[in-house]
Amino acid sequence: MVKNFNYMFVANILSALCKFLILLVIVRLGTPEDVGRYNYALVITAPIFLFISLKIRSVIVTNDKYSPNEYISAILSLNIITLIFVAIFVYVLGNGDLTTILIVSLIKLFENIKEVPYGIYQKNESLKLLGISMGIYNILSLILFYIIYSFSHNLNMALLFLVISCIFSFAIIDRWYLSKYYNIKLHYNNNIAKFKEIFILTIPLAFSSALGSLNTGIPRIVLENLFGKYTLGIFSTIAYVLVIGGLFANSISQVFLPKLRKLYKDEKKIEFEKLTRKMVFIGIFIGMCSVILSLFLGEALLSLLFGKEYGENNIILIILSFGLLFILSGIFLGTTIIATGKYNVNYKISLILLFCILIFSFLLIPKYSLLGAALTITISQFVALISYYYFYKRIF
């Protein structure tokens, strides 16, 4: 388990770093408006494609009923249908960012497909393979994005090369690994009945994931509508600490998921609770480190990395660092709940979070702008953490 943790730790640090550097490239070589366009596209697409991802990696780890081809066929079909509806919807609305939204949707589509091989690696505790696949995808994405964007200053063209990176890593790396190590030949299986079963099984988790992303996006949408893409760009750049932290915590929690599932099935309550405490401690430790760093070095780091206008808003980073502390601990408690197979709990917590986000977004953001958005996220995540703890204590 220690080796697996090390592989995933390195892979997720690399993944988070590459995503951060892509944002940094846009900030340094582009404009706050470009940052706003990119983040607006993420805000629009993330809830939709997180829902349609069906949280398939976690389901593969905890469910033995379906084959890899049934999983990937369901994911592919649902994502293509969703992409078509997104294109029609955005076109009808006449959104000027249609192209950016569609390209980001394509990235999400292929990332969802990659979740199937990731789930297979994880189920078999072959996290070295998962780490290599993630590493190749993220490094290739960063290199191609930097080259294209630095020469063209065309955001959409650079994003297209992220799509190419994702297709390459799946078609060449993942398919080869699955064939070599598991004798799995992926192909499309047109079984509508199975699609329906998988979709119904995963709805609670998928709904929870989509709500989680929507909860993150609502303050950004309100901010953009009231203050414009420039302000959204400033906030989204600073708030990227939450994206990176959440990505890191979600990925690391996947290392513990098979072990937690086994302990729960074997009714080893003491070991189950001990591992849960260890995970929550990791979340608290990382969260406290982010708070301390933002307090003492936040302004200097923001100014150095992004520019003076970002450093002047260090208070936003400090407030969001407390939010990150709550998010990380909540993610690990949520993983513990998923390991029990009680998928319906997570969407209840997401609904509670949505209610809080909506209230505070409309109370605080119009009056306090960036500060209001940061407070909205942090207060709501604290409520979510309390909710996770309440449901966790009712597991056994």
From Swiss-Prot:
Domain of life: Bacteria
Record-level GO cellular component terms: plasma membrane
Gene Ontology biological-process annotations: capsule polysaccharide biosynthetic process
Claim: Membrane is one of the keywords in the record: yes
Record Pfam families: Polysacc_synt
Major localisation: membrane
Transmembrane annotation, as ranges: 7-27, 41-61, 74-94, 101-121, 129-149, 153-173, 198-218, 232-252, 279-299, 315-335, 351-371, 372-392
Pathway: Capsule biogenesis; capsule polysaccharide biosynthesis
Family the entry assigns: Belongs to the polysaccharide synthase family.
Role summary: Required for the biosynthesis of type 1 capsular polysaccharide.
Name this protein carries in UniProt: Capsular polysaccharide biosynthesis protein CapF
Gene that this sequence comes from: capF
